[in-house]
Amino acid sequence: GPQQENMMEE
């Protein structure tokens, strides 16, 4: 399936 990348910055 598709790859998902998520990035969170505080």
Swiss-Prot record:
Keywords attached to this Swiss-Prot or TrEMBL record, sorted alphabetically, are:
Cell membrane, G-protein coupled receptor, Membrane, Receptor, Transducer, Transmembrane
Which GO molecular-function terms appear in the entry? G protein-coupled receptor activity
Gene Ontology CC terms: plasma membrane
Q: Source organism's superkingdom?
A: Eukaryota
Protein location: Cell membrane
Q: What is its main location?
A: membrane
Q: How is this protein situated with respect to the membrane? A: Multi-pass membrane protein
Q: Does the keyword Lyase apply?
A: no
> Into which family does the record put it?
Belongs to the G-protein coupled receptor 1 family.
Its protein name is: Putative G-protein coupled receptor
Q: Which organism is it from?
A: Mus musculus
Taxonomic lineage is: Eukaryota, Metazoa, Chordata, Craniata, Vertebrata
